[in-house]
A protein has these predicted regions:
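Non-catalytic DNA-recognition/assembly elements of restriction-modification systems
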Residues: 5, 9, 60-90
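Heptad-repeat alpha-helical coiled-coil segments used for dimerization/oligomerization
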Residues: 37-43
Length: 172
């Protein structure tokens, strides 16, 4: 349908105003989301390095970026509390991916396209529900989590076991 030119102009003016208002709301909400994500990161960092008791006696951790930690806590390298696991791949398992938001799940749970499949799954390993998984290249960016799925993964994912609380390690 084609409206008269003056009505087209009014429609365009109306839509310009409405879309600008919606865009402003989206920008404001995105700013709030960014602020909340930053706050979430600070709460996690503060809690895993300082604990839950703000009145606890503190000591120097010996690690510059951590600073002081509760006096009754120890500082130990990850290699002493984490063990690499190598599990066999099961036939017909789907591919698991460790995403930067910390989700470790079957790739098909997140998307259907936009990734490549490997013809030869050399070095692939099995992953079970509850496994602690760290992405070998994106772990620093948050690609660490606990698997919610059973499947297989490329060698870039590290499956780890620990006697510590896996959820705590995931946040750390």
């Amino acid at each position: 349908p084609v409206a008269p030119i003056d009505e087209q102009q009014r429609i365009a003016d109306f839509l310009d105003a409405k879309c600008a208002a919606i865009d402003a709301l989206v920008a404001d909400i995105q700013s709030q989301i960014d602020t909340l994500e930053q706050y979430k990161r600070s709460v996690i960092t503060e809690t895993v390095t300082k604990g839950l008791n703000p009145d606890a006696e503190m000591k120097d951790s010996g690690v510059q970026w951590i600073g002081d930690t509760p006096a009754h806590w120890g500082v130990i390298r990850g290699k002493y509390i984490l063990r690499y696991m190598q599990k066999p791949v099961r036939e017909n398992d789907g591919v698991i991916t460790c995403f930067r938001d910390g989700e470790v799940t079957l790739r098909s749970n997140r998307r259907e396209d936009g990734f490549t499949m490997s013809d030869k799954e050399i070095g692939y390993q099995g992953i079970d529900v509850g496994d602690l998984v760290v992405h070998g290249m994106d772990g620093f960016a948050g690609a660490i989590g606990i698997s919610d799925s059973r499947g297989k993964a490329s060698p870039v994912l590290n499956v780890l076991d620990t006697d510590q609380c896996k959820r705590y390690i995931m946040y750390y």
